Amino acid sequence: MKLLDTSVVVDIDRGGVDDKVATLDEQGRHLLSMVTVTELQLVVELQHDPGTDAYREAQDKLTRLLSRFDIHPVSRPVATTAARIIGSLKQQGRPLDDLHDVYIAATARTQQLPVVTANVDHFERIDDVDVIDWETF
């Protein structure tokens, strides 16, 4: 099992990565952070007016996409780990501006899973998180 970053799920949704998806599928189910679900839902909310057919279609498409994965909540251990990551990076003078990625990394760390991402530079500076580059996956 691996934790997939939002960048990977967006790429899967866009298509054209069948070989990578086949490799993931061979490895079993994978995990998403609730943060990824929030980011994907935000796209639906910003691109479509609620109550429209386009909104319902986008929502249905998102539901089908998310059904392929297990979803991990932002739990107390994840929040605590995220705070520790933020504190450590700030003390090192290497803050990470993207709080979403901090929570995704914290989920990976608490679940002891590698994170698969197209944004390797966001995650490599975080200790105790194994990073797999989606571009070379």
Regions found by a protein language model. Name each.
Residues 71-114:
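Active-site neighborhoods of divalent-metal-dependent phosphate/nucleic-acid chemistry enzymes
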Residues 5-6, 40, 82, 108, ...:
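Generic structural signal for small/hydrophobic residues in well-ordered secondary structure
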Residues 1, 105, 111-137:
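Acidic, PIN/NYN-like endoribonuclease modules and their adjacent C-terminal/linker elements
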Residues 1-36, 44-63:
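Short, well-structured N-terminal submotif of metal-dependent ribonuclease cores
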Residues 11-12, 40-43, 82, 126, ...:
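Residues that scaffold the ATP/ADP-binding catalytic core of kinase and kinase-like folds
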Residues 8, 36, 78, 104, ...:
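Alpha-helix capping/helix-boundary segments
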